[in-house]
A protein has these predicted regions:
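Conserved Rossmann-fold NAD(P)-dependent oxidoreductase catalytic core, especially the SDR/UDP-sugar
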Residues: 17, 42-89
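C-terminal substrate-binding subdomain of Rossmann-fold SDR/epimerase-dehydratase oxidoreductases
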Residues: 144, 148-152, 156-214
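Conserved beta-loop-beta element that borders a ligand/cofactor-binding pocket
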Residues: 57, 62-63, 98-123
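Active-site helix of classical SDR
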Residues: 89, 93-96
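Flexible, glycine-rich beta-alpha linker
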Residues: 67-68, 88-89, 113-131
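NAD(P)H-binding glycine-rich loop region in Rossmannoid oxidoreductase-like domains
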Residues: 2-36
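Glycine/proline-rich active-site loop of Rossmann-fold NAD(P)-dependent oxidoreductases
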Residues: 95, 108, 121-134, 144, ...
Length: 214
């Protein structure tokens, strides 16, 4: 009912679905994660169908978590058509969301997009397992210590670019249903940390420590 009330009040023509619990919460509270990420998404699509909203676009925020470890893929990186091999509940539930998005389009004909994000850093990225590099940036600014909990290579998005990417997914001309990876920049965690240290030195910042967790 709360979803229907919100839709009745807003009467949206374009809908961007960002609501979800992130990876750590899905791991620690799996039933709650299922309720929010899967059932919440299902209720939203159900309400959109039953209320016959005048929607011109529906965009579902998906994730690169639907894919497996980067080592499973080639040098060209992960493509939207590559096999889905998630390694946690969050990833499986994003697959469920993409399936619901496609089913919604097939029943409603509303142009629908599933947009997959990778690792986001910057303002507003305060939670989630891959928020570590945002926390590292804060440690630099405050002169504190922060331990990086993982290594490897990631595809990174600055948070402002994520907002712009979603805006384009909502308003750019599009018909049908599609799944897309939001473009980003790929580098290792070591390379990202080296850039942080370089910029901090140029700004005269010191007193911080960013080691890897043992």
């Amino acid at each position: 009912k709360s979803i229907q009330s919100a839709l009745e009040k807003a009467k949206p023509t374009h809908l961007l679905h960002l609501g979800a619990l992130q990876t750590p919460d899905c791991r620690d509270y799996p039933i709650r994660g299922l309720d929010v990420n899967v059932l919440g998404t299902a209720y939203l699509f159900k309400a959109c169908l039953e209320m016959e909203l005048p929607l011109e676009r529906f965009v579902f925020a998906s994730s690169s978590a639907v894919n497996g470890p980067r080592a499973l893929y080639g040098e060209e990186g992960v493509r939207p058509e590559d096999p889905l091999q998630p390694f946690n509940l969050y990833g499986y539930w994003k697959i469920a969301g993409e399936g619901m998005a496609q089913a919604y389009h097939q029943e409603s004909t509303v142009p629908t997009v599933s947009l997959r994000l990778a690792t986001t850093y910057g303002p507003g990225r305060d939670r989630g397992f891959t928020a570590a590099l945002t926390s590292a940036l804060k440690a630099v600014a405050s002169g504190e210590r922060f331990e990086i909990p993982y290594r490897g290579k990631e595809n990174y998005h600055f948070s402002h670019d994520v907002g712009a990417g979603f805006a384009r997914a909502v308003i750019d001309p599009f018909i049908g249903y599609g799944v897309y990876n939001l473009p980003g920049q790929t580098c290792t965690v070591d390379e990202f940390l080296a850039l942080i240290h370089e910029e901090a030195e140029d700004m005269g910042l010191d007193g911080f420590e960013i080691p890897y967790a043992e």
